[in-house]
Every structure is written in structure tokens, then in C-alpha cells.
Amino acid sequence: MPTFPKWESTTLESTYDYVDYVSMHQYYGNRDNDTADFLACSDDMDEFIRTVVATCDYVKAKKRGKKDINISFDEWNVWFHSNAADDDITQNHPWQVAPPMLEDIYTFEDALAVGLMLITLLKHADRVKIACLAQLVNVIAPIMTDQGGGAAWKQTIFYPFLHASKYGRGVALMPLVQTTKHDTAKHENVTDVESVAVYNEEKEELTIFAVNRTLEDDIELTTDLRGMEGFHLVEHIVMEESDLKLVNSSYEEKVVPKTVNRSKMDGGIMTTLLGKASWNVIRLSK
């Protein structure tokens, strides 16, 4: 938007003393059918967050304030599949009762994008204190239901969200990652591997979330865990598909996570094979 981030600065200068959060919304889509560029969408999300945080801190400094304004990322997801169908409904079939609008059916590559966005949100957990999927059932949602009281079923994007919710509790640890990079149609210096770790002190668990967003090559990830003495490998969960456009349905959920034997520990050093275009959850515990 032409007014971004001036609008945020202007409104915060008038409201700084009365508010605690700035609301952010962002949806992404693969309208150009360019998977490599689509999977760089989390870089845009990262820059979006950094810009809003910088704006909040600028206003804090200008106001000689004492408090940080944090972020509530109220809406985020992939959203584009249903656009044409929705246009047809509104233009050619208006005034229906409960028409099936915004019912995106998500592909496996959408699940990778959602996983990348989750990693980005966790990386910014110091300032992103709230983050919501605004719609949970049917409407750009991880869960779908069939008309007439039929089955409920899980979309591809359900699983990265499940993993982050279940295992992403605790303290987010910013990893120091050395990785090769690539360029896409609209992005430069895109990291081949995106990752973040979460330490749950109460349960003595460490979880690493990682996405290999290259489309051609497996990558070996080496993790130095010598500072986490006593931790052992629990499991390595993977989502990967040869067909990036594969979807789930009420008849068959083809895209599901699986447990693999691709991680091993040796003297505090863990090596993990990240398959091409894959979502990985590596769990460790004492």
C-alpha cells in the first residue's frame, strides 16, 4: 500500500499511550503457478513484520515512551484458490443462502508455505505475541466439512499448524544457520533451508521445525546440540510429496505426515536429511 508504513506511524503517534498491539493481516497465493517464488512468501512476511516493528520502535522513541508496541498478526494464511469461483457466485449467482464461498482446497505446496509462515512467526515471537488463523472451518480453513452433515476432514495445511501448536510451546530459539541460497522470479537470496527451534523447559523437550524449500535437491542439515547436554532424538516427522499439487478430500487424505529415520545423533552433533520440498519436525527430549 502506498501509505505503508506512514499510516501505522501516524496512527501510533496519536494512540501510543492507549494501545498495546498493532494488527497485521497478510495472505499469500501462487497465482503465477511458480512454486519456487511462492515458497519465498515467508521472506515477504518477515520483511513486513520487521517494518512494522521498526515503525513501532520509532514512535516509541519519538514519544519518549517506555513500553514496546507488539504485534497481533490477526489474519494470515494462503488464499487464492477460490477467487475465480467466488467471483462467479457474486456476479452470476447472487443472493444465495450460505453459498460455498472462500472454500480453498489446499495443495501440498500450500502446506509448505504455511509451515514457512509458522517458522517466521516463531522467529519473531519476541514481538509477535498473538497470531491467528482467522477462519478454521470451511472458509480458507484447515478443516472442511461436507454438506448435509457429512464427514469432516483435514486439509494439507492442518498438519504444520498442528505440529506448531503441539510442539511449538516454550521459548523460541533463533538458530544461527549457514545455508546456500537461490533466486526466484521476484526474490533474491532466498535461503534453501528455513528453520527455528523451540525449547520447552517444563517438559525438557526441544523441537526443530525446518523446511527445505528447494525443489530439486535433498539437503543435509547439521545441528550442533552440544549445549543441550542429555538430549536424545525422539522422532523425525516429515511431510513430502512428489506431486506438489496433491490435495486431500473427504474421500481420501493423501497428504499426511509420516515418521522417518533420517536423523542421527553423534556426540552432540545431529545430522538430518531434509528431503527436497519438505516440512520437517525433529523432536528431542531428555
What label would you give each PLM region?
Residues M1-K6, Y28-D34, N77-N83, V137-I143, ...:
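Flexible loop/turn segments at secondary-structure boundaries
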Residues P2-S14, L116, T191-V193:
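Alpha-helical scaffolding within the catalytic cores
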Residues E8-D46, I69-N70, D74-W79, Q91-H93, ...:
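Aromatic- and acid-rich polysaccharide-binding/catalytic face
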Residues V52:
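Active-site-proximal structural segments of metal-dependent nucleotidyl cyclase/transferase enzymes
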Residues N70-S195, E201-E204:
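Aromatic/acidic polysaccharide-binding cleft in carbohydrate-active enzymes
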Residues V190-G230, H236, N280-V281:
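Carbohydrate-binding surface patches
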Residues M228-L274:
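Acidic, Ser/Thr/Pro-rich beta/coil linker or hinge segments at domain junctions
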Residues T272-L284:
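Short Pro-Gly-centered flexible turn/kink motifs
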